[in-house]
């Protein structure tokens, strides 16, 4: 038996490469304690090296004593809420979540704001067995066996190539130089401790072909006149040997695939020697040998030099003498000659200084992924991945980010849809920067044609007019509160209407409600009560106000004027008569005439005018066929649209503060917002998540619109201007939080400042509100400091973060409350505020928003 072992050992030594010299230590009797450096490696399968092709050694795992079950108390609801709140704000004591966020934040800062400080990279470049060189261009020196502690000897792994066991130094650039990997004792860790090792990504067993694919291949072979068996053999034999892991049903972790051919016990050597010829080598068929003889020009890949880019792309370590490296596609199978492997990795540009980076730094900038298909629903249904996943599918999963920009995509879809519907329904206003005038001859209320002019502001965004945008939900103060000036304007118009009467033309051509000055004394009769004999009685006395064309309390049935519900003396408080008892012959001149004018709401300030339908349509007004007086209609309700007011006299559409965030002035305006969202907003949402970004986006936009409604109350504004500046404030906060680790923070600061100043100057154009920009930016700063968890530098910084969250939340709530008080209780009228948001380069460049400027 011992002779057989010696034969197997000598046979195995003959198979060893001639350039590999190893000194195997003598067997040491088992000690009471394990060596300190082998304590982490509890499994014997970890004690294998990769000096020979891997095999699955049947080594029994050491016996583990059964652990006692540790009973733990279930966390209370208060502790769960407290821990969840701390995690959400980024001040949790959980080191894993904190390190995860720090890795994402530093990676985002390095990509957006530039290079990090050298000392930051030096601090991150810790001496670890996981460190790796990205270039992999260093060739180790010849094998050397030196002394080691604990009676063991060190083994130099020739295949490590500077991948592992890098030590930190104090160079100027913060990068460390690789050292020769030293494997303690018989455990060669260089091949599986590095993240660049090929055993991190073991090749998977090829899937079985479908019936359709095999049928198609068979038909193609018959058409070409080839044998189906030959094609199958050529496709199947592309490796010098099949890895033993392919024969197993379940894929195990990479340390179990390491070989112990040179360093394991004698029993293991005998077992591996007996199974080595059967499981490793495959004898090529005669057809394959004939194909190889026919193509002698094909280069053998065994022992060839690998290009550096190819090595880094495939993440495969260099093969052994009898390796299983895949040949080029289409290459025939050839016997593998026993030649010495080349230890160089070819690089076109050669090794360059400063191109190596350690694994902790690589993990720092590695994108944290959310497992595809294993989200919240996957956790509830106990969903898991299968044991073997195709490499292409796995690569797609690894390319996905941790946070998906759901809010960005939803917002972009809503913006695009609303803009398309608005343009299709309301059309496109005249394009330009000035005012557009339209002149036409229109039939007026007096029964004659007159030349009238309609003026409207041009829209250079290629979109609807301002009246249409207000009707859709734009920010407009008179629709959100009872504006004092608009309300006084409406009350003055009602007072004039109170003293009006029906003007009946003498030729019986028509009548219209008007004042005495507008009624011709020679061509018409002004039927004014109580002077005119047709005046009705009220409580035994003649009515003092009236008459009203086509409305009289004596002939109206619904609503009827009966005691105790008699119509009041003031005609501006009369209701609309929906049913009349008499026809066209009442012997009352104001009732038997043909009415030529009814109320029409024109403009955006609640102006009502008794006029003809033709004139109302020409002025893009809202004509009321059912009413006879302007006091019977509520023009602000018509102008604002959306949901009717609870009290027709008091506008209450406060929801315009956030509804206008989803509207745009035109197609170009929407394209600008989409570009911003798909670049800046999506990137930040991938970093912070949709919930934080949605809170900052909406609250910043609401605050910006509220400030704009205070200082520019009569200007219709749409678009997420305040929200976008709030998102820009997030970038500033991120820069301030990462100031200590950036190499050139001032450069990044001035770049962001230049972008903000450019957008602020862009807000001097019409239809863009700088007050929303400023308020949205300030509120975005407060919200970003409160809701975005960023890097903490020590325990003191963690406590500072907690105080910062409370302070900035209180400051933001104070800012919002102050703006609400100013808007509803202490209205502000600012004369010069318009120049801050629109500079009048010409007389008609900026639209006049004063109430006395009747543009419509």
UniProtKB/Swiss-Prot annotation:
GO biological process: cell migration; cell population proliferation; negative regulation of protein secretion; regulation of epidermal growth factor receptor signaling pathway; regulation of proteasomal protein catabolic process
Keywords: Endoplasmic reticulum, Glycoprotein, Golgi apparatus, Membrane, Phosphoprotein, Transmembrane, Transmembrane helix
Main location, first listed in the record: endoplasmic reticulum
SUPFAM superfamilies recorded: Rhomboid-like
Key word Cytoplasm present: no
Region: Disordered, residue numbers: 1-21
Phosphothreonine: residues carrying this PTM: 180, 183
Record localization: Endoplasmic reticulum membrane; Golgi apparatus membrane
Side of membrane Cytoplasmic, spans: 1-412, 678-692, 737-747, 795-804
Residues recorded as bearing Phosphoserine in the entry: 76, 176, 391
Gene Ontology CC: one annotated term: endoplasmic reticulum membrane
The organism's place on the tree of life at top rank: Eukaryota
Side of membrane Lumenal, spans: 434-656, 714-715, 769-773, 826-856
GO molecular function: serine-type endopeptidase activity
Residues with glycosylation annotation: 584
Membrane-crossing segments per the record: 413-433, 657-677, 693-713, 716-736, 748-768, 774-794, 805-825
Membrane association type: Multi-pass membrane protein
Oligomer status and interactors: Homodimer, or homooligomer. Interacts with TGFA and HBEGF. Interacts with EGF; may retain EGF in the endoplasmic reticulum and regulates its degradation through the endoplasmic reticulum-associated degradation (ERAD). Interacts (via cytoplasmic N-terminus) with FRMD8/iTAP; this interaction leads to mutual protein stabilization. Interacts with ADAM17/TACE.
Function of the protein: Regulates ADAM17 protease, a sheddase of the epidermal growth factor (EGF) receptor ligands and TNF, thereby plays a role in sleep, cell survival, proliferation, migration and inflammation. Does not exhibit any protease activity on its own.
Family of this protein: Belongs to the peptidase S54 family.
PANTHER family tied to this protein: INACTIVE RHOMBOID PROTEIN, INACTIVE RHOMBOID PROTEIN 1
Name of this protein: Inactive rhomboid protein 1
């Amino acid at each position: 038996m011992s002779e057989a072992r010696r034969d197997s050992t000598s046979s195995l030594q003959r198979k060893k490469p001639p350039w590999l010299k190893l000194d195997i230590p003598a067997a040491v009797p088992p000690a009471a304690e394990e060596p300190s450096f082998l304590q982490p490696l509890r499994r014997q399968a970890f004690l294998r090296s990769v000096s020979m092709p891997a095999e699955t050694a049947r080594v029994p795992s050491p016996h583990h004593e059964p652990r006692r079950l540790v009973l733990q108390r279930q966390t209370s609801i208060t502790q769960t809420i407290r821990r969840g709140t701390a995690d959400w704000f980024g001040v949790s004591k959980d080191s894993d979540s904190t390190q995860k966020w720090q890795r994402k934040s530093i990676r985002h800062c390095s990509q957006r704001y530039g290079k990090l400080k050298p000392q930051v990279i030096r601090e991150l470049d810790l001496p670890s067995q996981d460190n790796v060189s990205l270039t992999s261009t260093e060739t180790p020196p010849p094998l050397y066996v030196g002394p080691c502690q604990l009676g063991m000897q060190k083994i130099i792994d020739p295949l490590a190539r500077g991948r592992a066991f890098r030590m930190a130094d104090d160079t100027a650039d913060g990068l460390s130089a690789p050292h020769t990997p030293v494997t303690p004792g018989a455990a060669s860790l260089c091949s599986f401790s590095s993240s660049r090792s090929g055993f991190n990504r073991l090749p998977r067993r090829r899937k079985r072909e479908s019936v359709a694919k095999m049928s198609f291949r068979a038909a193609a072979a018959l058409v070409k006149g080839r044998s189906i068996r030959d094609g199958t053999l050529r496709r199947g034999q592309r490796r010098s040997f099949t890895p033993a892991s392919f024969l197993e049903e379940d894929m195990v972790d990479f340390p179990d695939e390491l070989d112990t051919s040179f360093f394991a016990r004698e029993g293991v050597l005998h077992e591996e020697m007996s199974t080595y010829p059967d499981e490793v080598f495959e004898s090529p068929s005669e057809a394959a040998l004939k194909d190889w003889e026919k193509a002698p020009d094909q280069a053998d890949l065994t022992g060839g030099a690998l290009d550096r880019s190819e090595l880094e792309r495939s993440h495969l370590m260099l093969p052994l003498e009898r390796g299983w490296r895949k040949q080029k596609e289409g290459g025939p199978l050839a016997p593998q000659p026993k030649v010495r492997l080349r230890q160089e990795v070819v690089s076109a540009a050669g090794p360059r200084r400063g191109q190596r980076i350690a694994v902790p730094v690589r993990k720092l900038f590695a994108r944290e992924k959310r497992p595809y298909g294993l989200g919240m629903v996957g956790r509830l249904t106990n969903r898991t991945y299968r044991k073997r996943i195709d490499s292409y599918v796995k690569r797609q999963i690894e390319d996905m980010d941790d946070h998906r920009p759901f809010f960005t995509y939803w917002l972009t879809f809503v913006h695009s849809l609303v803009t398309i519907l608005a343009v299709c329904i309301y059309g496109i206003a005249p394009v330009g920067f000035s005012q557009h005038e339209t002149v036409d001859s229109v039939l007026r209320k007096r029964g004659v044609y007159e030349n009238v002019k309609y003026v409207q502001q041009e829209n250079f965004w290629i979109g609807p007019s301002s009246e249409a945008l207000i009707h859709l939900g734009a920010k407009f103060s008179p629709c959100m509160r009872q504006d004092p000036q608009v309300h006084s304007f409406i009350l003055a118009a009602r007072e004039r209407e109170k003293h009006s009467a029906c003007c009946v033309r003498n030729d019986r051509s028509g009548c219209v409600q008007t004042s005495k000055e507008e009624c011709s004394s020679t061509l018409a009769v002004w039927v004014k009560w109580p002077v005119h004999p047709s005046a009705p009685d009220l409580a035994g006395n003649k009515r003092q106000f009236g008459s009203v064309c086509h409305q009289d309390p004596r002939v109206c049935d619904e609503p009827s004027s009966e005691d105790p519900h008699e119509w009041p003396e003031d005609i501006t408080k009369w209701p609309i008569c929906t049913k009349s008892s008499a026809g066209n012959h009442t012997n009352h001149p104001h009732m038997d005439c043909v009415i030529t004018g009814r109320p029409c709401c024109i403009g955006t300030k609640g102006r009502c005018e008794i006029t003809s339908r033709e004139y109302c349509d020409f002025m893009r007004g809202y004509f009321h066929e059912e009413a006879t007086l302007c006091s019977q209609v509520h023009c602000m309700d018509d102008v604002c649209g959306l949901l009717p007011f609870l009290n027709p006299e008091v506008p209450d559409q406060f929801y315009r503060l956030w509804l206008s965030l989803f509207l745009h002035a035109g197609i170009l305006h929407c394209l600008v917002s989409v570009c911003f969202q798909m670049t800046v907003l999506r990137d930040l949402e991938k970093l912070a998540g949709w919930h934080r970004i949605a809170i900052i986006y909406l609250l910043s936009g609401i605050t910006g619109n509220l400030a704009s409604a205070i200082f520019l109350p009569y200007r219709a504004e749409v678009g997420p201007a305040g929200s976008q500046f709030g998102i820009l404030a997030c970038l500033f906060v991120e820069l301030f939080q990462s100031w200590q680790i950036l190499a050139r923070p001032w450069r990044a600061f001035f770049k962001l400042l230049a972008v903000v100043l450019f957008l602020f100057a862009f807000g001097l154009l019409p239809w863009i509100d700088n007050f929303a920009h400023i308020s949205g930016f300030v509120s975005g700063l407060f919200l970003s400091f409160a809701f975005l968890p960023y890097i903490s530098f020590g325990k003191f910084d963690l406590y500072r973060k907690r105080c910062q969250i409370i302070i900035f939340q209180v400051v933001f709530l104070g800012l919002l409350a102050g703006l609400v008080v100013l808007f509803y209780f202490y209205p502000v009228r600012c004369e010069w505020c318009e120049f801050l948001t629109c500079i009048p380069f010409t007389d008609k460049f900026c639209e006049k928003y004063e109430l006395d400027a009747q543009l419509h």
